[in-house]
Amino acid sequence: MNNKIKINKSLKFDISERPLIIAEISGNHNGSKKKFLNLIKEAHKAGADLIKIQTYEPSDITIKSSKKKFFIKSGLWNKKNLWNLYKKAHTPFSWHKDAFKLAKKLKTTLFSSPFSERAVDLLEKHKVSLYKLASLEITDLNLVKKIAKTKKPIIISTGAATLKEINDCLKLIKRYHRKIIILHCVSDYPTLNQNADIQRINFLRKKFKSNFIGLSDHTTDIHSAVAATALNVVVIEKHFKISENSKSVDSVFSISPKKMVQLKEFISKVHESLKSKNKKTQKNKHFRRSIYALKTIQKNEKFTKENIVALRPKLGLCASKYFKILNKRSRKIILKDSPIYEANIK
């Protein structure tokens, strides 16, 4: 089974390395191109390995209608009209050129979730390195096929999809390539920590026989993302906002630059502790015990509880040999407080 998926010259998904961090800009620009470009700058500055945007026009997702069926009935966007919500949140196609130009200048990797075939065409013009398929688009097999045919790595979010839908999607992509990363995701906005279901990462890994599993996290903090690191994910995605006080369509479950810095620091430390080996070092000998002479022991004298003791540091025979040498005899004179070695024993 492959252990790496190359993204570009500088990045790869690697099961032996720290999870890559994706900063999802989404609609946190509030319709301002200036803020949009600034979000890319700040995400890069905060340490995001990849920066993701969303490529669609409202007409790629819904119909302009004021009928009741086109209004959201619960959650964060309760009573919002679909068309108006996507109009507010979308990143205009005309902004993409400057976004990719900025990413190139910053030497960061910018990519996107396309929501239509024409969006894929636009992204191909900008030579994206990879794609993300949103969980709500996983059943749009025309879109899946269009993305798969680029033969670029695809990150698949699974939040709103059934196992059969995920499987059908994977089968289609595998006709073209196997550079697939599967994300565990809960499509609640925001997701409560008690509903994060982080253990599902292991289920997805086993179910789809993949090393390349990640997390798209919609909780309001970074705890779930840090916990996922211990389950050997290759990527973690968090929505990103310009500051703690920012107000936008996704701001409730987005993190600030300060939190992004913390996230990278914490997952780096967790990953470090997971891959570290408990190797013996010269330092620990000072905290281990070995056998010493309690008093001067004469040549041919027996070792007894009265003349040997286990003390620190470990310079001679390990303390575990204590009972084995009792009643054996010394080959030579051993001075008081000297360590006892194998060569000292008959």
Locations of regions flagged by a protein language model:
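Catalytic cores and adjacent flexible loops of soluble metabolic enzymes
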Residues: 1-346
